[in-house]
Amino acid sequence: MFQKALWLRTYQQSKYVVWLFWLVSFYSLSYKYYMTSIQQQHFLNDNKKWNYVYHYHFDLTLLDPIMLLGSILTILACTLIGWERQNNASDLLWSMPFKRSHLYITKWLFGICNIAAVVILNWGLFAIMKRLTFHNKYQVFSPFHSYFIYMLIVLIAIYTLALCVGTITGNIISQGFLTVVIFIFPLLLPPLISGVIAVHSNVDFHEKNGRIHDVMENIRISSPAEDFTINFNYDPQSAYTDQNGVRHNEPNFTKIPPAKTLIAPIAHILILLPLGIYLYARSANERNGNYLLYPKLQKIVLVCAIFFGGIVGGLILSHEQSLPSFYIGFLVTSFITYFFLPKILKWKVSWNFK
């Protein structure tokens, strides 16, 4: 797994995506942080010029860079597994004197090293710029430690998920699509369940949503990033009391989710990494190019797609929680999915260039 030839081949296969990941990370994090300091300095000079009262404001969310960088990491994982399956490059790779498990671990470690390097470098640049720029007068750096730790864990979990999905899919399209579906499914499940309850019991659509959302929060990879906000605001009018009765006075209005939210992404890493190694070592090359490598899994995906697709169609077509219109939409959408999806899953995608 530490063979130089494997690492060089992995880099050559994905170098453009890797460089895109580095450039986007520095632009969306360090560059924007620096430009914000220049902007605030400019506001201060303008306020002094016009004798206005200056209010320093800085706001940084974790979810936005997670979604942006996570998307690129998904493309990276698709490039390392889905692309080589699609153009049959895996046949040559697996004929080399390397264990399949070592090939997979090399791909995983390659991505993890890039993630760790990017996060640590941006972490250090933030610390340097905070001390040397206008931010130093108004910020404390302690929230940024949690910010980058949470970012590191969540990005590793997203990459691990995308790579693991590549062990059950046969081309780059299905790997990317299925990764997105699995990632957002815990976000969509609460409104789907509460919507069905509302249609059948005339209970308010959002009444049951909170409890289901709390359950899904414990299994979502993105859970640690969803409510993470670093906010420095020197405006006394922004002081408030949160839902737990804690008084937040200016200037630091930072909101950091509890550490227990990290359990979900860490659990995904611990489960999906060995699962991915196991499945990759037993992948069937003869089904490369198909949307799914395992026929039994294809049946499960088909059943789930018909069922949940029907629910979505029923909720869209139901009017004012009308039960008949819900079932009409459910049956129509399920039939359309049942008719077209098996035909799509039989397609085989194969490109003969590398």
Residue ranges and their predicted role:
Residues M1-R85, K255-K260, L272-S325, T333-K354:
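Hydrophobic alpha-helical transmembrane segments
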Residues N51-L62, F110-T179, L187-V196, N202:
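Secretory targeting signals
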Residues L62-D64, P143-L155, A259-A267, P324-F335:
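Alpha-helical transmembrane segments of polytopic membrane proteins
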Residues L80-A116:
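Helix-loop-helix units of permease transmembrane domains in multi-pass membrane transporters
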Residues G176-P186, G329-T333, K354:
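Central hydrophobic cores of alpha-helical transmembrane segments
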Residues L192-M216:
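Extended amphipathic alpha-helical segments with heptad-repeat/coiled-coil character used for oligomerization
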Residues Y240-H268:
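Individual transmembrane alpha-helix segments
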